[in-house]
Amino acid sequence: MKKTLLASSLAVGLGIVAGNAGHEAQASEADLNKASLAQMAQSNDQTLNQKPIEAGAYNYTFDYEGFTYHFESDGTHFAWNYHATGANGADMSAQAPATNNVAPSADQSNQVQSQEVEAPQNAQTQQPQASTSNNSQVTATPTESKASEGSSVNVNDHLKQIAQRESGGNIHAVNPTSGAAGKYQFLQSTWDSVAPAKYKGVSPANAPESVQDAAAVKLYNTGGAGHWVTA
């Protein structure tokens, strides 16, 4: 299940988290009550939606009784999700894709199953698609990339799948809970770190699709898919 929330009000939030100094650790390195957190996540305990599990920035991932759980915060936004261990793409209690002007990057929708949607691709350029296992080992498989419809930027298959899960491909989507916006559900701080100077401080949802695509490709190429919990 993926939730993205403001500290006063999911990662992703990362929806998406990038460049924030903080405390990142696997759950095995921290004194966490895995059983309690797992039970709260499985029951969609509203406490997880109302406040972070601890103060400050953190990033915890652990396996418990057949499921993988993830809890994170950049100190302002916080998120959590879980899925069956080893599952590829289907969160057990998932993020609902955004449509029109309501779009969770990581969100409050309960018991909605994420689906990967892959548009037909024509071979042009190749970029690696990272697939990360629970022990953080990464294997790369090739993905094709081509320009998005309405954009001249080459976007690889993996990013297109991320865009579908994050916003349904809606470039004007906005998550009213987390503030994440645009086709790739950027948080404003993340957007400002990769957007052209002209669009820094501007909501991603108000930027042209080609600008959003270019920013997403830049973020993906510099940090991989880890910026998106739905990846």
From Swiss-Prot:
Compositional bias (Low complexity): 119-137
Signal peptide: 1-27
Cellular location(s): Secreted
Pfam name, any one: Transglycosylas
Chief localization: secreted
Biased composition (Polar residues): 96-116, 138-153
InterPro entries, per database record: Lysozyme-like_dom_sf, RPF
SUPFAM superfamilies noted in UniProt: Lysozyme-like (SSF53955)
Keyword Hydrolase carried by entry: yes
Induction description: Positively regulated by sigma B factor.
Keywords: Glycosidase, Hydrolase, Secreted, Signal
Catalytic EC class: hydrolase
GO molecular function: hydrolase activity, acting on glycosyl bonds
Record field: transmembrane: none
Region (Disordered): 92-153
EC number(s) reported in the record: 3.2.-.-
One term under GO cellular component: extracellular region
Annotated family: Belongs to the transglycosylase family. SceD subfamily.
Function: Is able to cleave peptidoglycan and affects clumping and separation of bacterial cells.
Protein name: Probable transglycosylase SceD
Species this chain originates from: Staphylococcus aureus (strain MRSA252)
Gene name, Swiss-Prot/TrEMBL: sceD
